[in-house]
């Protein structure tokens, strides 16, 4: 980050930066921390898909139950522990020292167009949902591919902070699921279940994976069509075929009410 921002400075007359992030006071700021800065620093306990008994949010859960008991260090949590303090300090330091001007006032939705402008050398972590935009043809205005559509970038392993130990999660990805409410009339529930089978069927899922590049089936990522397309996807296929994919996990069961907690988390 320091090398590109302070040593290289310019490439072909264009100012370049070694980092991209965002810092606007908005709910997505909370995502930035709980999604990966905290887990990469080593907040929480060893455990997959999330730490046990303390997850990457720093929330401790009673052993053998689904009862969260606290996030403060004084209550056995880690939300204000050394790893969390380190993560937020580094996020702030890198944002102000190495990211483009104005990044501190951007939110999640403003940072992606800035990233695809082509003058940011690297990002400490990103969401694979960005891939489709980053491999779009140059004719669409995307500056992160060459004239032949080959990515001018490469996905790399998530970096590890000083408090990270083997066996911890290391990154984040959303995991979709179908929720069928008991309160929904049975005939409608059956219809929803049938539709779900269609959506996750191999044929539909493979097509969806090629369009959105968000993989949900093992058969999708191992399909020969993805082997053929892999050179154009900057490491996405290799990542999802590697053991590292299990280190990227969604928010876990220690978080009792995500919408309510997410609303207050970023403000603190």
Predicted regions and their residues:
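Short, hydrophobic alpha-helical packing/hinge segments within bilobed ligand-binding/sensory domains
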Residues: 4, 111-115, 130-132, 192, ...
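Periplasmic solute-binding protein
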Residues: 1-2, 22-70, 170-181, 260-268
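Bilobed periplasmic-binding protein-like "clamshell/Venus-flytrap" ligand-binding domains
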Residues: 4-23, 201-213
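Short helices/loops that flank or line small-molecule/ion binding pockets
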Residues: 2-7, 109-119, 123, 267
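Glycine-centered hinge/linker elements that transmit conformational signals in sensory
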Residues: 2-5, 46-105, 149, 158
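Paired acidic/hydrophobic, glycine-rich loop segments that form the ligand-binding mouth/hinge
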Residues: 121-126, 133
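C-terminal capping/gating helix-and-loop segments adjacent to ligand/active sites or protein-protein/ligand interfaces
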Residues: 214, 235-268
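Extracytoplasmic/periplasmic substrate-recognition and gating elements
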Residues: 96-101, 110, 119-122, 138-220, ...
């Amino acid at each position: 980050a320091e090398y590109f921002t302070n040593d290289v400075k310019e490439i072909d007359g264009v100012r370049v930066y070694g980092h991209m992030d965002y810092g606007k006071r908005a709910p997505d700021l909370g995502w930035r921390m709980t999604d990966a800065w905290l887990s990469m620093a080593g907040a929480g306990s060893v455990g997959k898909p999330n730490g046990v008994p303390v997850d990457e949010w720093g929330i401790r859960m009673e052993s053998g139950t689904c009862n969260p008991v606290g996030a403060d260090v004084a209550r056995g949590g880690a939300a204000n522990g050394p790893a969390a303090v380190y993560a937020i300090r580094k996020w702030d330091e890198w944002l102000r020292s190495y990211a483009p001007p104005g990044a501190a006032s951007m939110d999640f939705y403003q940072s992606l167009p800035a990233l695809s402008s082509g003058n940011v050398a690297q990002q400490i972590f990103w969401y694979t949902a960005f891939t489709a935009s980053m491999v779009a043809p140059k004719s669409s205005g995307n500056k992160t591919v060459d004239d032949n559509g080959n990515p001018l970038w490469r996905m790399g392993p998530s970096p590890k902070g000083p408090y990270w130990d083997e066996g911890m999660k290391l990154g984040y990805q959303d995991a979709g699921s179908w929720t069928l409410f008991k309160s929904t009339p049975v005939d409608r529930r059956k219809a929803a279940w049938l539709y779900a089978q269609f959506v996750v069927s191999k044929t539909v899922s493979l097509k969806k994976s090629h369009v959105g590049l968000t993989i949900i089936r093992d058969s999708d990522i191992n399909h020969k069509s993805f082997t053929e397309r892999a050179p154009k996807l900057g490491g996405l296929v290799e990542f999802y075929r590697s053991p590292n994919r299990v280190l990227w996990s969604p928010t876990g069961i220690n978080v009792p009410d995500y919408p309510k907690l997410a609303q207050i988390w970023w403000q603190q």
